[in-house]
Curated annotation (Swiss-Prot):
Transmembrane among keywords: yes
Ranges for domain VWFA: 98-294
Gene3D superfamilies named in the record: von Willebrand factor, type A domain (3.40.50.410)
Keyword match Transmembrane: yes
Name of the protein in question: UPF0353 protein MRA_1491
GO-annotated cellular components: plasma membrane
Domain of life the protein comes from: Bacteria
Classification via SMART domains: VWA
InterPro entries: Aerotolerance_reg_N (IPR024163), UPF0353 (IPR022933), UPF0353/GerABKA_families (IPR050768), VWF_A (IPR002035), vWFA_dom_sf (IPR036465)
Transmembrane residue ranges: 18-38, 67-87, 309-329
Family, per entry: Belongs to the UPF0353 family.
CDD domains xrefs: vWFA (cd00198)
Length: 335
């Protein structure tokens, strides 16, 4: 949790847990204090004249004299927690990652079951995704139907991606497997030239489609979608799939109405095989929400951050109160 003026405070993820051995020292000090109080009582009981004892004993309640010691022990406990180095999860923007946006431009994307059409809605939502993605991420764009084409190689130039989205053209058939293999090749190419680490940058494919793969018809074919998804899994590249449309979509081809229902099952299977997540959207608003969710997942990474400062501040406050209490409660005034 995060408290005002104190910052994040947790009791987990200790970086230096061996500092808790200092608690034995604190326990020893508490035991010593108790022994000193018992010895003090024994010395006071040596007075045979109880009237004399009452005249020299403090008039105020004796329990208040323990407040400074209690606050001191509390401060030591708080300092011990701080020294043990508690940590908390911190989300920071990624500055070294590759995302390939793979969009289906087959004829089924002409369907108007999503206003104004599946394609236009896809373009608008993808532009929003490009705008919101953290600046350090390299974003690439692939359009596919019967073949897959890299329209924009992974780059931090968002305008290039948005301009390419405006120029998407319809084509026949749907070769989802080829599109995934093309995305993996683009990721491997840019990963070889991006510096900043000893390992390739983290990568992800965002696959947007509305229908079944038609080329090849068997997704387990060597060039099929399921085979490509397994390859992505082997290369550590999860695929986030978005199936877009409704079961009632249709297009007019040669003056004939052709039903083009959305195919959720294939997309879910692709995501599952690759180790990614699947989403579905039937409206532009839902699609925007999906892209926003993906942006939060892809654009940020979670690291361990220091959470000891709040405990240090509380410890310092307790120590200051202990000193103040010692001055106010245990002061000696002349009589």
């Amino acid at each position: 949790m995060t408290l005002p003026l104190l910052g994040p405070m947790t009791l987990s993820g200790f970086a230096h847990s061996w500092f808790f051995l200092f608690l034995f020292v604190v326990a020893g000090l508490v035991a010593l204090y108790i022994l000193m109080q018992l010895a003090r009582q024994r010395r006071m009981l040596r007075f045979a004249n109880m009237e004399l004892l009452e005249s020299v004993a403090p008039k105020r309640p004796s329990r208040w004299r323990h407040v400074p010691a209690i606050l001191l022990v509390l401060s030591l406990l708080l300092f011990t927690i701080a020294m043990a180095g508690p940590t908390h999860d911190v989300r920071i923007p990624r500055n070294r990652a590759v995302v390939m946006l793979v969009i289906d431009v087959s004829q089924s994307m002409r369907a108007t079951d999503v206003e104004p059409s599946r394609m236009v809605a896809a373009q608008e939502a993808a532009k929003q995704f490009a705008d919101e993605l953290t600046p350090g991420i390299n974003l690439g764009l692939i359009a596919y139907a019967g073949t897959a084409t890299v329209l924009v190689s992974p780059t931090t130039n968002r305008e290039a991606t948005k301009n390419a989205l405006d120029k998407l053209q319809f084509a026949d058939r749907t070769a989802t497997g080829e599109a995934i293999f093309t995305a993996l090749q683009a990721i491997a190419t840019v990963g070889a030239v991006i510096g900043g680490g000893d390992t390739p940058p983290p990568a992800r494919i965002v696959l947007f489609s509305d229908g079944k793969e038609t080329m090849p018809t068997n997704p387990d074919n060597p060039k099929g979608a399921y085979t490509a998804a397994r390859t992505a899994k082997d290369q550590g590249v999860p695929i986030s799939t978005i199936s877009f449309g409704t079961p009632y979509g249709f297009v007019e081809i040669n003056d004939q109405r052709q039903p083009v229902p959305v195919d959720d099952e294939t997309m879910k299977k692709v995501a599952q095989l690759s180790g990614g997540n699947s989403y579905n959207a039937a409206t532009l608003a839902e699609l925007r929400a999906v892209y926003s969710s993906l942006q939060q997942q892809i654009g940020y990474e979670t690291i361990k951050g220091d959470a000891s400062v709040g405990w240090l501040r509380l410890g310092a406050l307790a120590l200051a109160l202990a000193a103040l209490a010692a001055l106010l409660i245990n002061r000696r005034l002349p009589t």
